[in-house]
Amino acid sequence: MNEIIKAMEERRSIRKFQPTMPTKDDLAQIVEAGLYAASGMGRQSAVIVAVTNKELRDQLAKTNAEIMGKPDFDPFYGAPAILIVLADKSCRTAIYDGSLVMGNMMLAAHSLGLGSIWIHRAKEEFERPEYQALLKKLGIEGEWEGIGHCAVGYIDGEAPKAAKRKDNRVFWIE
C-alpha cells in the first residue's frame, strides 16, 4: 500500500501522551510538513506558532479548558508540544488553508511515530488580548484567526483502533 494512504488510514487522535518532549528535529519536520499544505491560490495564509515552553503550554491549556467550561481538565491530554495554526483573516480561504496545515502536521506526526490530536478553541483564545499580545511579541502583525492546536507527543499506551467507516458517504457519477 502507498505510504501516504497507509498513514491516512492508520493515524488516530491520541488522548493520552507521555510527558517526554519530542525531539526538535521531529517537531521541525512536522512544522515543515504543515508549511507544505495546499493553500488557496498558493497564498500560504496560515502561520504556525510552535510551543515547547511548558509554562506557556500550561497557560494555553488553562485558557482552553476555561473556554471549554471544564477548568480542571487538560484539553491537550498531556501532550508536551502544541503547534498552533492561525490564518490571515483577510484571506477568503484562511480556514481551509489552516485546516490543511493541521491535517498535514497530524499525518507527519504519525509518520514519525508520534501521536497528535486536533484541539479546537484556538479561535476564542486568539481573540483574547493576552494572546493577541503574544502574536505581536512574535512579530505576527495583522488580523489572525486561530484554526486549531495540533497537540503532539509520544503516545502513552496503544493507539485506539479505527472506527468502522460509515456507509453511504460516497456517491459516484459516471
Write out the residue ranges for each language-model feature.
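Acidic, surface-exposed loops and disordered segments
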Residues: 1-174
